[in-house]
């Protein structure tokens, strides 16, 4: 066994991977983590909701508060015959640790814990507070997870100063990318009403597909905004269109369209809703439209947290990191409501949600070292 596969972070990552915590089942991961943190003086609060396990852990009672956030749940393994080794039996081969959750994001959680253990052992009287916010409902509908903890904290006026979400953000090598924000996500379910009829007698019917087509073309052609330094322009995409009975001689009576905005911080959800309705109304459509806002955009500028994490990456692995807001949503969108500086950082994401998910062995302990250096920078009087 190599040094990379015998360290404390590797060992804890394997313990977590071996628990088949398919969302929303925590499978005892939070209890394992709490048992590691209890001797360090952490206080624990379970904020479980509707079968979802949520843990808030904090050491210290003063500011600044540095929180590590993440999720213990994983996506289903998929067809087992596609895996070269059982997905919940951590396996080492070819310089990689394989298993469901290895990259997304049990190695990050293990790295949080071991970084905290070393930091507290060396600096038991550090300034401020260390916190962990963990959930088993990130890969699912995410309505009973992190958002419930944030609501509880906000309800008693508790705020965070810095938060690192351990999502796998690196692209080619550990440390090359920090996510310092995410676009918002606004979805719509549109039902265009027509009149069903026989295709041979279109004058006796109203085809909702034909009526919607010009509006679709206009919506698809709109440049919603120009983006900004950190965000690309807002996009509008149709994901599903459904109409008809399956017969080729029946004009459908309704057409259902599912679409999604991924929007930059320069646009608001209300503005996008209003502009969409203007287009639909201008085309004279008879319609119903239901909206779902699953996440507002958030952005962390080049402040103390970005600087501390970037320096930690450079000092540990010699990589000059880049800031990015690309990709989907994360639980950072909830945490941003109670924290001004939220970033995501973790291992390479090339295999997440795939068969044979893995993390590089030689990235595991360095990831923990990066988190520890970030603690040093933000919770020691002189930042060292």
From Swiss-Prot:
SUPFAM superfamilies: Bacterial exopeptidase dimerisation domain, Zn-dependent exopeptidases. Zn(2+) 1 binds at residues 71, 104, 167. Disulfide bonds: none annotated. GO terms for biological process: diaminopimelate biosynthetic process; L-arginine biosynthetic process; lysine biosynthetic process via diaminopimelate. Its cofactor is Zn(2+); Co(2+). GO terms for molecular function: acetylornithine deacetylase activity; cobalt ion binding; succinyl-diaminopimelate desuccinylase activity; zinc ion binding. It catalyses: N-succinyl-(2S,6S)-2,6-diaminopimelate + H2O = (2S,6S)-2,6-diaminopimelate + succinate. It is an enzyme of class 3 (hydrolase). Its EC number is 3.5.1.18. Zn(2+) 2 binds at residues 104, 139, 353. Pathway: Amino-acid biosynthesis; L-lysine biosynthesis via DAP pathway; LL-2,6-diaminopimelate from (S)-tetrahydrodipicolinate (succinylase route): step 3/3. Keywords: Amino-acid biosynthesis, Cobalt, Diaminopimelate biosynthesis, Hydrolase, Lysine biosynthesis, Metal-binding, Zinc. Transmembrane segments: none annotated. Binds 2 Zn(2+) or Co(2+) ions per subunit. InterPro entries: Bact_exopeptidase_dim_dom (IPR036264), DapE_proteobac (IPR005941), Peptidase_M20 (IPR002933), Peptidase_M20_dimer (IPR011650), Peptidase_M20A (IPR050072). The active site is at residues 73, 138. The keyword Cytoplasm does not apply. It holds the Pfam family M20_dimer. Belongs to the peptidase M20A family. DapE subfamily. Homodimer. Catalyzes the hydrolysis of N-succinyl-L,L-diaminopimelic acid (SDAP), forming succinate and LL-2,6-diaminopimelate (DAP), an intermediate involved in the bacterial biosynthesis of lysine and meso-diaminopimelic acid, an essential component of bacterial cell walls. PANTHER family: ACETYLORNITHINE DEACETYLASE, N-ACETYL-L-CITRULLINE DEACETYLASE. This is Succinyl-diaminopimelate desuccinylase. It comes from Aromatoleum aromaticum (strain DSM 19018 / LMG 30748 / EbN1) (Azoarcus sp. (strain EbN1)). The lineage of its organism: Bacteria, Pseudomonadati, Pseudomonadota, Betaproteobacteria, Rhodocyclales. The gene is dapE.
